[in-house]
């Protein structure tokens, strides 16, 4: 991607949330290893912070120790949930006076020039909040369009991914941090993006053009073997999720 305005003057930082417990599978730990290894390889001058959300098993801790000399690793005292963990990420990045921040989950794979691709798109489009839309989830509903004459990608179904997103200090100043309510895993990032839309900080929820050349969601991440669940309580968990999502939808409607 051409650097029309150049990005070398920008200070960039990424913060990654991670978590495990005694039920976390070996597959999931390998996913985290692959993610951090790729980031180490293509880090460049980006500040990197790993935020461990209050819980980790033995294998996870061994893995984190291996990267202790490469990344700044912060251990939250207790598991507070994804919103609080993401807020810790934002606070730590802002304290480093970054111009552009990246928030990511621990199952993203990084390719060469990933940071520059997003930073260049931010400069050229004037859109501070991009979200990565993994093709294996959104391929059938992705559409190429342009904004400020720059190619971008939008999701025609209105889907909003949360595994990787960008922000700037201006975004946080105007809409604040992640809200703790609603307590629904997977909805906190939607609320953040909806607020960017509501406050007209972004024209739509976009990803950069050709983002899969720069980021990838780990191919095992959506495999059921990557996360061990209580099969006996699975049906109940699904019903609870539906109930929570209905409440979340009401919440979204009331703020828009």
Curated annotation (Swiss-Prot):
Molecular functions (GO terms): glycosyltransferase activity
EC number: 2.4.-.-
Pfam families (UniProt xref): Glycos_transf_2 (PF00535)
Top-rank taxon, per record: Viruses
Keywords per UniProt: Glycosyltransferase, Transferase
CDD domains reported in the protein's UniProt record: Glyco_tranf_GTA_type
Class in the EC hierarchy, top level: transferase
Similarity-based family: Belongs to the glycosyltransferase 2 family.
Protein known as: Uncharacterized glycosyltransferase R363
């Amino acid at each position: 991607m051409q650097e029309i305005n150049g990005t070398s003057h920008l200070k960039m930082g990424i913060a990654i949330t991670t978590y495990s417990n005694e039920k976390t599978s070996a597959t999931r730990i390998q996913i985290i290893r692959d993610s951090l290894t790729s980031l180490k390889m293509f880090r460049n001058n980006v500040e990197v912070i790993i935020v461990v959300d209050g819980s980790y098993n033995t294998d996870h801790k061994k893995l984190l120790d291996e990267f202790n000399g490469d990344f700044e690793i912060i251990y939250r005292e207790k598991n507070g949930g994804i919103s609080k963990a993401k807020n810790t990420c934002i606070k730590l990045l802002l304290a480093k006076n970054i111009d552009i921040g990246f928030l990511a989950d621990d199952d993203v794979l990084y390719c060469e020039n990933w940071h520059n691709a997003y930073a260049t798109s931010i400069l050229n489009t004037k859109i501070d909040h991009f979200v990565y839309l993994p093709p294996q989830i959104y391929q059938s509903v992705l559409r190429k369009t342009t904004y400020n004459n720059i190619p971008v990608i939008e999701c025609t179904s209105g889907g909003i991914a949360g595994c990787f997103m960008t922000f700037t200090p201006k975004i946080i100043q105007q809409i604040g941090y992640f809200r703790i309510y609603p307590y629904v895993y997977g909805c906190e990032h939607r609320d953040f993006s909806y607020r960017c839309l509501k406050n007209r900080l972004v024209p739509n929820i976009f990803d950069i053009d050709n983002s899969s050349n720069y980021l990838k969601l780990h191919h095992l991440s959506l495999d059921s073997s990557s996360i061990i669940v209580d099969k006996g309580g699975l049906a109940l968990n699904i019903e609870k999720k539906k109930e929570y999502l209905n409440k979340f939808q009401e919440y979204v409607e009331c703020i828009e």
